Structure formats: C-alpha cells, structure tokens
UniProtKB/Swiss-Prot annotation:
Organism (species): Conasprella ximenes (Interrupted cone)
Entry keyword annotation includes Signal: yes
Residue positions assigned to the propeptide: 21-39
Disulfide bonds: 42-56, 49-61, 55-66, 60-73
Coiled coil stretches, renumbered: none
Signal peptide: 1-20
Any GO BP annotation: defense response to bacterium
Primary residence: secreted
Keywords linked to the UniProt accession: Antibiotic, Antimicrobial, Disulfide bond, Secreted, Signal
Protein name: Conopeptide X11.1
Function field: Antimicrobial peptide that potently inhibits growth of Mycobacterium tuberculosis (H37Rv strain) (MIC=3 uM).
Lineage, broadest ranks: Eukaryota, Metazoa, Spiralia, Lophotrochozoa, Mollusca
Entry note about domains: The cysteine framework is XI (C-C-CC-CC-C-C).
Tissue expression summary: Expressed by the venom duct.
Family according to the record: Belongs to the conotoxin I1 superfamily.
Amino acid sequence: MMKLSVSFLLLLMLLPFITGEENSDSDVLKSGAAVRQGRGRCRGFREDCSQHRDCCGDLCCNGNTCVITVIACPKW
C-alpha cells in the first residue's frame, strides 16, 4: 500500500512536466494550488483573461475569456 501511495504522489508531481504545462520552480512548490506567481489566482471558466497562461489548467484564453477547447491552446 505504501508503494502505491508513493507512486501516486510521484505521478502527481511529474504530471505537469509530462503534459508540457509551463511552471516556474516556485509554482511547482505550491503543491498544485491554483496560484500564479506575481499575478494572483488563475482565472476559471468564463472569467476575463489576456493570455492563455492567465487561465487555470487546460482552459484557453479566447476573446479575453477563459474557455474550454477541443484542442490544446497555441503556445503564443
């Protein structure tokens, strides 16, 4: 049971690197909290944004609003 728990925690820590999500070192240390360094909290669905990194998780900024998309956000 202990090995399973350790494996699960390791997977959670490595997931952002596997998915290609960009994080600074200090963001990774915040244990998955939805906080962006220097900009406060990330924006949720249908909240205002100016760029993709303003939005939480897999949400994309489209027309200054965080939305769910079928494909990944462009990296610009």
